């Protein structure tokens, strides 16, 4: 049996995280319980993804992080008992954001620093501005939530504008930058592992 790092561990029910080998998980991040992380995901320092709240059936609903998502420093992802979270492909969840399920986030969304989401559905290509709060709503595709706003009701959603071409380009740039970081850190880790392996081999030969 493979021994997992302490920062990647089961919940009280015994659900272990499932993490694709291509994902990059910072050693200071915490991945706990029924978490499914797909290929090419980046999870930055001090992020917490924790699926451990049992529902009425005694089971823990999953937190799913789909392909090429980047979860940045200090992000917290959790959910109510029996509730799941899904974050769609190529979405950026930036510094200090909180996603509390039940939540469903579509593909290529952008959550700016310190945003808070609770019991929401975000369709694709949505921009949530810095420090904004969204609760108990569904946001249509290409919606832009202004920084610092609080969105809790349907009329507030209807008053939001669509993202501009410039904002969509910025969203792509943020995603691309973090995708490069994942590849660079993986390359650095692989080099370090090769050096350790070579050093251990030389030491064994000398002692043998």
Tell me the role of every PLM-derived stretch.
Residues 34-40, 139:
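Short, T/G/N/S-enriched strand-turn elements that build extracellular solenoid repeat scaffolds
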Residues 67:
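A cytosolic small-molecule/anion-sensing beta-strand core signal
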Residues 70:
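Glycine/small-residue-rich phosphate/adenosyl-binding loop
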Residues 2-18, 46, 50-52, 56-62, ...:
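Glycine-rich hexapeptide-repeat left-handed beta-helix
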